[in-house]
Amino acid sequence: LNALKRFPVAATATIGLCISLLLLVNLPYEQVKGSILYEPSYWYVWVGALPLAASIALCFENRLSPTIRHSVSLLAVLLWSLYGYISNDTPEHFFGALAFIAPIVTFFSSLFWAAFLKKDTDTSFWNFSYLLCIQILTGLLFASVLAAGLSLALFSTDTLFGCEFKSEMYSNIHVLCYTLFFPFYLLGNIPIASITETKVHSFAQAWKILGLYILLPLLILYGTILYAYLIKIIIQWQLPDGWVSALVSILTIGGTITLFILYPLCIQENRPLKFFRQWFGILLLPLLILMTVGIIRRFQDYGITTNRLYILLLNFWCYTTALYTIFTSGKKIKIPFISFILLFLISSIGPWRFSEITRYTMHKRIDTLIQNNKLGTNNLLTFD
């Protein structure tokens, strides 16, 4: 009931997704093929509607009346549905699907930060994110136990009494547990952002072990390997391998995640972590230059591709994150995550997205080759 009262649009979207999946599971293939249930964009719209509506409601929970807030959520879902309907992208292909996946990832991530767009809300943001993660894991655990228990009960009835249930019954159980029970549980237990403590919430010992004794040593190991490689290529005076970009990216993203996980210890001025957060950004800069050189080498050797444009954008984000960490001493954790998601979104949708830039560049190169080698006449490609 709390889910319906607080997030009516998101709850309605959950019910719609559940009903659609039940129809997909139970209808004959001949009926499904050729129907709207066979369209990938239809499913992208349903999956994105839930987090979008919930994020809008969280963003305006303390700013607008419930009626206006829910109306804005409904309008956002309708616009998202219109985007799915009029989009020219082909979801069957990876980069076409990315035009839908990027917004959906943004919608889901905004559940964590939509209510904390104001300045100096990093502590409340961390508390809210921590509590939300606990609710997500708890909800998934409950849904899994419920699905397993009901499936076992169905199997036992089938075995003992020879009822011969159809295999679709097991699928129906999982659909109901994971697309109805779990979302309703989560919507009903999302923390209220306005009452999130301004002091850091105490966190589980497991998080401290993960961040301080597992992730941090791994980051030191990666950093040592990369600095040894940097010294090697300087001595040998050779260009870096393009694969070094992956390791530097992992180091940057891993360091950012570690700072997020250990945020309470950052506030408490934990000595090992204090050294890490003060020097992390500074030590990253030489490695990021190494990454940039590797990217430039790839562009020179193989030209522009969509993947390389994403790597270049990631390199830009790594620079900004390193500089931001230096200037804030690693005590601000919100901006790096929001900027990462928004850059991914902007570069994946619209006519300016990287896949379109790559397609345009390749067409221009092919046209230039045809004209320079006189391979075509009247816009037609000809061969001797």
Label every model-predicted segment.
Residues G350-D384:
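Membrane-interface segments at or immediately adjacent to transmembrane helices
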Residues R6-L27, A49-L50, R69-S81, P103, ...:
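Alpha-helical transmembrane segments
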Residues N26-V45, N62-T67, I86-I101, T159-I173, ...:
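Membrane-helix interface and helix-disruption motif detector
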